[in-house]
Amino acid sequence: MADHMMAMNHGRFPDGTNGLHHHPAHRMGMGQFPSPHHHQQQQPQHAFNALMGEHIHYGAGNMNATSGIRHAMGPGTVNGGHPPSALAPAARFNNSQFMGPPVASQGGSLPASMQLQKLNNQYFNHHPYPHNHYMPDLHPTAGHQMNGTNQHFRDCNPKHSGGSSTPGGAGGSGTPGGSGGTSGGAGGSSAGGSGGGSTMPASVAHVPAAMLPPNVIDTDFIDEEVLMSLVIEMGLDRIKELPELWLGQNEFDFMTDFVCKQQPSRVSC
């Protein structure tokens, strides 16, 4: 094979070498460089071709600096899975069906943001309590397009302040036009600036929802007042021993303890 390659490369290069100590394209008998100076100029352009040189069998073909490797349809040539087109390798890979649209394209991001906004509105409308959440945009380039519809998610407080057991969302209102949001309650109210976000009251000890990561959409802070109102409403504060505490224990131990506790009462009766 080495003799065959030397015969193919003999007399092709003006410096008298046979091409075995140069670019991998020379080893395949595909290079047509006139001088070493021209070879140094073309060296950065053939970085992709040098990587592809390990996977192509020796055969007829041509090397082009602008269009990459264009395989000949003759015998002894392997296409390697790429179509025999004159496009650059980067252009062929960018048009692949496995790659998404570029980030800079605004045409595909707007329908996706509209669909996300529709899902967010359905989620917040079916929420049991009318909290004003913060929902950041998942697409970084579509933030300026949805300012009119997402403004009420940004300008309102993540949690309401109030001394009553009911959430203060009934007294709060947020305007999407950018005039700020107000959240009412028994403890007080806070008014936000014009489109810049609202100031957090001192009574709220929770972390602002704006610091949440963008992929967490179901994270909600626990309001102790609402939780205690539910406990009092269902009467859980009057129960000494909850039956859920027995879950996860052995049934034999549960029955033994239950029978031992019930025997003195039976004897006394």
Swiss-Prot record:
Ranges of compositional bias, category Gly residues: 165-198
Keyword Acyltransferase: no
GO MF term (any one): LBD domain binding
InterPro entries the record matches: CITED
Free-text tissue specificity from the UniProt record: Ubiquitous.
Region (Disordered): 142-200
GO CC terms of this entry: chromatin; cytoplasm; cytosol; nucleoplasm; nucleus; protein-containing complex
Entry's Gene Ontology BP terms: adrenal cortex formation; adrenal gland development; blood vessel development; bone morphogenesis; cardiac neural crest cell development involved in heart development; cardiac septum morphogenesis; cell population proliferation; cellular response to hypoxia
Record keywords, A-Z: Activator, Developmental protein, Differentiation, Nucleus, Repressor, Transcription, Transcription regulation
Subcellular location: Nucleus
Highest taxon in the source lineage: Eukaryota
Keyword DNA damage among record annotations: no
Disruption phenotype: Mice embryos die during gestation with left-right patterning defects and severe developmental abnormalities, including cardiac malformations, exencephaly and adrenal agenesis. Show also impaired mesonephric tubules and adrenal cortex development in embryos.
Function field: Transcriptional coactivator of the p300/CBP-mediated transcription complex. Acts as a bridge, linking TFAP2 transcription factors and the p300/CBP transcriptional coactivator complex in order to stimulate TFAP2-mediated transcriptional activation. Positively regulates TGF-beta signaling through its association with the SMAD/p300/CBP-mediated transcriptional coactivator complex. Stimulates the peroxisome proliferator-activated receptors PPARA transcriptional activity. Enhances estrogen-dependent transactivation mediated by estrogen receptors.
Subunit field text: Interacts (via C-terminus) with EP300 (via CH1 domain); the interaction is stimulated in response to hypoxia. Interacts with PPARA. Interacts (via C-terminus) with TFAP2A, TFAP2B and TFAP2C. Interacts (via C-terminus) with SMAD2. Interacts (via C-terminus) with SMAD3 (via MH2 domain). Interacts with LHX2 (via LIM domains). Interacts with WT1 isoform 1 and isoform 3.
Homology family: Belongs to the CITED family.
PANTHER family: CBP_P300-INTERACTING TRANSACTIVATOR 2 (PTHR17045:SF7), MELANOCYTE SPECIFIC GENE RELATED CITED (PTHR17045)
Stated name of the protein: Cbp/p300-interacting transactivator 2
Source species: Mus musculus (Mouse)
